[in-house]
């Protein structure tokens, strides 16, 4: 991962690596024009967040072919710039962004929840702009199909893996997630897209196949010693806390900073 550091970008390109940047539009937009004029923006750039980015900045990203991930939960959770994820702005400028969970140490890597939060926040943003702010930009209602596409096809494209994953297409590897629509929280299901985006949870996943190999079946992960995995996690966390002199309090109202010497 590199920030707006052209020398690191050049090294990444020399090595054939994609360049992932934590990009905050309101803070960094002023640098885009110079980067674009120098030919330093391209399809190997992946910008995460893109919050509060002005229209001129979006046009530069689109023209340069920069790929974009938006982070519904993270942007709101941390109050990044205006706190609003940038999916609507990206779509308005002809960019199809992927969805990113961004920070699995703060909350679970749950793409079902990411889609739901995106749906709700986009609705709130639309109503706020139309009724409170007189916004010049009309917010079009997102459909569940669009959010599922952002979580699958567009996410694969952002990762540069669109030729091998993201959809069930001849020539791509067989990646499947089978959801048990007979589970009571999903039953009866009247619409596939709505069920996945609005109601499904990870507990509803019955089977997972990656590249044709079944890695989860009957709701159980295969080939993983869960007990040993938990032990390794506990050992790692204990080491980090002890090294930092941090004493966790499971009922604390907030994560307090470490004491300074």
Language-model features: locations:
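Histidine/acidic residue-rich metal-binding segments in metalloenzymes
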Residues: 1-70, 79-97, 113, 163
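Conserved active-site and cofactor/substrate-binding residues in soluble primary-metabolism enzymes
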Residues: 3, 7, 26, 30, ...
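Structural signal for hydrophobic packing residues in well-ordered secondary-structure cores
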Residues: 12-16, 39, 119-123, 159, ...
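Generic beta-strand/beta-sheet core signal
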Residues: 22, 48, 69-71, 100-102, ...
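Catalytic metal-binding/acid-base residues of hydrolase active sites
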Residues: 24-25, 52, 74, 104, ...
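Alpha-helix N-cap/helix-start motif
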Residues: 28, 79-80, 108-111, 167, ...
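Active-site microenvironment of metallo-dependent hydrolases
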Residues: 146-261
């Amino acid at each position: 991962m590199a920030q707006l550091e052209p020398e690191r970008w050049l090294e990444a390109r020399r090595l054939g690596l994609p360049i992932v940047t934590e990009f905050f539009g309101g803070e960094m937009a002023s640098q885009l024009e110079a980067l674009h004029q120098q030919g330093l923006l391209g399809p190997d750039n992946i910008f995460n967040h893109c919050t509060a980015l002005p229209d001129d900045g979006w046009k530069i990203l689109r023209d340069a072919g920069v790929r974009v991930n938006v982070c519904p939960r993270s942007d709101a959770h941390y109050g990044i710039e205006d706190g609003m994820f940038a999916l609507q702005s990206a779509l308005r400028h002809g960019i199809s962004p992927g969805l990113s969970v961004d920070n699995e140490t703060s909350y679970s890597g749950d793409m079902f929840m990411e889609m739901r939060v995106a749906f709700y926040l986009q609705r709130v943003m639309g109503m706020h702009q139309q009724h409170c702010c007189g916004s010049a930009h009309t917010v079009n209602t997102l459909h569940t199909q669009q959010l599922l596409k952002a979580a699958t096809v567009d996410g694969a494209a952002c990762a540069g893996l669109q030729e091998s994953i993201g959809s069930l297409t001849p020539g791509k590897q067989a990646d499947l997630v089978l959801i048990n629509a007979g589970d009571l929280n999903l039953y009866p299901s009247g619409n596939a897209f709505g069920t996945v985006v609005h109601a499904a949870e990870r507990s509803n996943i019955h089977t997972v196949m990656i590249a044709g190999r079944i890695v989860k079946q009957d709701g159980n992960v295969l080939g993983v010693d869960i007990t040993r995995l938990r032990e390794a996690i506990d050992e790692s966390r204990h080491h980090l806390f002890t090294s930092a002199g941090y004493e966790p309090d499971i009922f604390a109202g907030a994560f307090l900073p470490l004491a300074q010497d």
